């Protein structure tokens, strides 16, 4: 029915001594499991932003980014949750967010889903707002 059941920050954990981090796959699994508890599993779908390399991004940064993407795909595959992918240009164009600042997506998400406003109260919550809008775009445009 297009219901967005939850949104949370990507769990991370420290790696090594250089203040680096990586996604915490176990915690991602736990968060997803908790979010879909009691839901009809046949109606659950993971919508992931299909991103690619960005100009000026270093090799290590791109490797870590790709690794995180792969972790998500692996978790959803293991949980037998179907996935679909949405390009940034498509969802941003749909919500009229092309060439806007990062905070514009937070404002748009709060306007559409005011019940998530407490989870989007800080500027650093723009990534969660993006996730909400990606899900909303998918629901409004997907051909089931």
Provide a role label for each language-model segment.
Residues 1-144:
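Phosphate- and other anionic-substrate recognition elements at nucleic-acid/protein interfaces
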